[in-house]
Design a protein with these regions (language model features):
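Non-catalytic C-terminal interaction regions
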Residues: 180-226
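A conserved beta-turn-beta hairpin within the catalytic core of GNAT-like acetyltransferases
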Residues: 17-26, 36, 160-172, 215-219
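Conserved active-site alpha-helix within GNAT-family acetyltransferase domains
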Residues: 42, 66-84, 204-217
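Conserved catalytic-core motifs of GNAT/GCN5-like acyltransferases
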Residues: 17, 63-64, 81-94, 214-225
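Conserved beta-strand in the GNAT
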Residues: 2, 8-16, 25, 151-162
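Conserved acetyl-CoA-binding loop-helix of GNAT-fold acetyltransferases
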Residues: 28-31, 37-51, 73, 77, ...
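Conserved GNAT acetyl-CoA-binding A-motif
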Residues: 24, 45, 52-67, 74, ...
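Amide-forming acyltransferase catalytic core, primarily the GNAT-like/NAT-type
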Residues: 78-165
């Protein structure tokens, strides 16, 4: 969606609809600096929310960097709430010549293993509710990996090939008593698939000390009931 003034673009916004999850994802809000006090961003979001309601969407979500105070203030003003904080790390792929003990077999038998309200699948930097249907699809595609101790899952991750970043694999680190092994497994997997970059997204506040692991910046996942 683009708004023009005298045939010159002054603002834009993008949205993606997820009918199965009854969700709209809003991103890419840009407003020319000369028009930022005109309430254009709020009007664009409101228009998309109305469109989402007409499509039977029940929630609207967006992701905002923690240091972006103007966007956070606007989102809160129009009814969005922070539902979680996510940390972003980057790492290079690497050949790991050791037995790590990560598997994709029988990691998830049921969505009951998750807190449905707070579980997400990250696709192209969009946080999608992890429904039972979505979970089964990921499991069948062998994108869910885990480390077990006496048949109990102690580390859980979702690994996907990024559609947003070139030559990149995404590790969503869901939980981890020993996340180092999951990270090393992802490094090795990326190396095998000829990817050079890894992006790690997690609610965990810190990760093990691994060479070249860079802590980028945190984001807030915002949500509004429609």
């Amino acid at each position: 969606m683009v708004i023009e003034n005298d045939q010159i673009p002054i603002s834009m916004i993008h949205a993606a609809f997820y009918p199965d999850e009854k969700m709209i994802w809003i991103e890419g809000i840009r407003v020319d600096k000369n028009f930022r006090k005109n309430g254009i961003a709020q009007k664009m979001i409101s228009y998309l929310e109305k469109t989402a309601k007409s499509k039977n969407c029940k929630i609207s979500r967006m992701l905002i960097a923690s240091e972006n105070e103007p966007s956070l203030t606007l989102a809160k003003k129009i009814g969005y709430k922070i539902i979680s904080k996510w940390n972003y790390f980057s790492l290079e792929s690497k050949l790991i010549d050791e037995e790590i003990g990560i598997t994709s077999d029988t990691c998830i038998d049921s969505i009951d293993s998750f807190d449905k309200k707070n579980s997400h699948f990250i696709e192209s930097w969009r946080w999608i509710p992890l429904t039972d249907q979505r979970l089964k699809k990921l499991n069948s595609e062998k994108k869910i990996f885990c480390q077990k101790d006496n048949e109990k899952i102690i580390t859980l991750g979702i690994i996907t090939e990024s559609k947003s970043f070139e030559n990149t694999i995404i590790l969503e680190l869901v939980s981890g008593a020993n996340s180092e092994k999951m990270i090393k497994f992802t490094q090795n997997l990326a190396h095998q698939k000829n990817y050079s970059k890894i992006r790690i997204l997690t609610e965990l506040e810190s990760l093990p000390s691994i060479k070249n692991l860079e802590n980028k910046f945190p984001f807030y996942l915002m949500e509004k009931k429609l």
